[in-house]
A protein has these predicted regions:
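C-terminal end-helix/capping segment
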Residues: 232-244
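Structural signal for interior beta-strand "rungs" in well-ordered beta-sheet cores
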Residues: 2-66, 70-229, 234-235
């Protein structure tokens, strides 16, 4: 069962590598990792100890820019990906170069994490979720199945983004050549939450412990500790005290 491991790659003690895996030049893989079958780890990738990378995952992919791309810089060679200790990368997941994943992060099956993204410790990126480029995500967040986080977004610590939640960064919906000056994704402060199938419009801010209920269209900033619902979203009530971040057990 043939693997291709470049002679310059450093493989830690006790690391297991599956069949038909490619590990390119100058890669570092820590001790006790488990690398599945048909995995591709691109040149220079830095992978910590006790990391699990499942079958068909791609680590350190350089982005491709279309002629009309507005947020991807053509020809820019990004720094190698860095993956912290005890992370898990699911089957078919893609983690781009220029990305930093903290310790204990889970990137679930078929999820995609683009370049220039930072993900804090113990955050979960759910199955088939998409994290576009130039995004910052804090620690202990949950970005659930099929959620879409657009470019230029900032998500604080202990945030929850429910399945199929969508964010946007272009108020001009692809029209007007000057629009790129005004791109801005969502900002979710620590403890903020977005419900199932909610849509957040460009530049909106969800303050700490703010909540967008399921199906909400967020057209205005959400105040701290308030639940917003409807289309357009309006304040419904305060977040119950037992759901506030400060009242949660570790």
């Amino acid at each position: 069962m043939h693997n291709i491991v470049h002679p310059s790659a450093q493989i830690g003690n006790g690391t297991q590598i599956g069949h038909y895996t490619v590990i390119e030049a100058d890669t570092f893989i820590g001790d006790g990792c488990v690398i599945g079958h048909h995995v591709v780890i691109h040149a220079g990738s830095k992978i910590g100890a006790s990391v699990r990378i499942d079958d068909h995952a791609v680590i350190g992919k350089q982005p491709v820019s279309a002629r009309r791309s507005k947020t991807t810089v053509a020809g820019r060679q990004l720094a190698p990906v860095v993956i912290g200790d005890n992370a898990i990368i699911g089957t078919g997941a893609i983690v781009y170069a220029g990305c930093r994943l903290g310790a204990g992060v889970l990137v679930a099956d078929t999820a995609s994490v683009r370049e220039d993204v930072v993900v804090g410790d113990y955050t979960i990126i759910g199955r088939n979720a998409t994290i576009e480029n130039r995004v910052t995500i804090g620690t202990r967040c949950k970005i659930m199945t099929d959620a879409y986080i657009c470019s230029f977004s900032e998500i604080g610590d202990d945030c929850f983004i429910a399945p199929c939640a969508a964010t946007s960064n272009d108020n001009y919906a692809g029209r007007w050549k000057e629009r790129t000056k005004f791109y801005k994704g969502v900002t979710v402060r620590s403890g903020g939450r977005i419900g199932v199938n909610a849509t957040t419009l460009p530049g909106r801010v969800i303050e700490p412990d703010g909540m967008a209920a399921a199906g909400t269209v967020v057209t205005r900033d959400i105040p701290e500790g308030k639940v917003v619902c409807g289309n357009p979203g309006k304040v419904l009530r305060p977040v119950p005290s037992n759901q506030l971040l400060r009242n949660q057990e570790e």
